[in-house]
Amino acid sequence: FIGGIISFFKRLF
């Protein structure tokens, strides 16, 4: 779950 959140933020930034 955490990994998914990080990936989402990485896409935004």
From Swiss-Prot:
Protein name in UniProt: Grammistin Pp 1
Gene Ontology MF terms: toxin activity
Kinase keyword on record: no
Record keywords, A-Z: Antibiotic, Antimicrobial, Cytolysis, Hemolysis, Secreted, Toxin
Family: Belongs to the grammistin family. Group 2 subfamily.
Cellular localization per UniProt: Secreted
Record carries keyword Secreted: yes
Self-association state and partner proteins as the record states: Exists as aggregates of 3-4 molecules.
Lineage: Eukaryota, Metazoa, Chordata, Craniata, Vertebrata
Tissue: Expressed by the skin glands.
